[in-house]
């Protein structure tokens, strides 16, 4: 079977309506189930970017590292679109944050009495959209 490695695909969306811009960052093939990432993501969705990064940095969850990295990537994309290198975390907000299920690697483990037990190694895709609103 294939080995899935975490990839980060960066897409930039530029929307100019009343000087509101947004950017997107996607982290794919995260080696954690979508359900476990969604548990942390539900807490972060309501925050501004600065508060979300602060919450995630001190969170003990494994998923918080991936989410924080993706948020920082989306903010960097937005600053690149704007052409502004000054980062004020309270000026950016999280517009969308969702996680989808990725491919599942299936492995077999030896079980008692000559049987084999199937192990599922889930992965997930995380998408974050940041806006200047």
What residues fall within each predicted segment?
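Ribosome large-subunit tunnel/peptidyl-transferase-proximal elements
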Residues: 2-4, 9-99, 125-133
């Amino acid at each position: 079977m294939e080995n899935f490695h975490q990839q980060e695909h960066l897409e930039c969306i530029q929307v100019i309506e009343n000087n509101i811009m947004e950017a997107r960052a996607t982290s794919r093939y995260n080696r954690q189930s979508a359900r476990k990432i969604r548990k942390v993501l539900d807490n972060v969705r309501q925050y501004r970017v600065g508060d979300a990064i602060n919450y995630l940095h001190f969170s003990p969850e494994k998923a918080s590292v991936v989410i924080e990295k993706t948020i920082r990537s989306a903010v960097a994309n937005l600053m690149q679109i704007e052409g502004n290198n000054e980062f004020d975390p309270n000026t950016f907000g999280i517009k969308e944050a969702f996680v989808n299920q990725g491919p599942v690697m299936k492995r077999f483990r030896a079980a008692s009495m000559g049987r084999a037990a199937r192990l599922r190694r889930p992965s997930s895709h995380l998408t974050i959209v940041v806006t200047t609103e």
